Amino acid sequence: PTMAPFCKDEEKYKVVEDLVKQVEELKNNSTRIDGQLITDVLTVNGVRFSLEDGSWGLIRASSNKPSLVVVTESPASDERKKKIFDFIDNLLQKTGKIGEYDQKI
C-alpha cells in the first residue's frame, strides 16, 4: 500500500535526504526488521530498502503535494508489511517534521 504523510514542501527533500543516510547506516550496522536483514539500499529519488525475504520499503518526496510517499510490500506476510511500515514511521516521527498520514496500514 501507498501512504502519504504530510510534510512541508520546503522540508520534504531534506527529510528524505536524512532518511537516506539513516537507512544506509542501518544496513551497514546489520539492522534487522522483523528478523530480516536489510540486504539492499537504492537511493534514486528517495530510498528503497530490501530485506532478505524480498520484502521492501520505500520513502520519497511527493513531486506534486506537500507530503512524502511511503510504500511497503512483503511476499511473506501482511504482518511483515506492517512491521516495515512501523519501522519507517518510527524514523519519520523522530524527524518532528511529519504530519498526519492520508492512510495507515
PLM-predicted stretches and their roles:
Residues 1-71, 77-105:
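Phosphate-binding and adjacent anionic-ligand microenvironments
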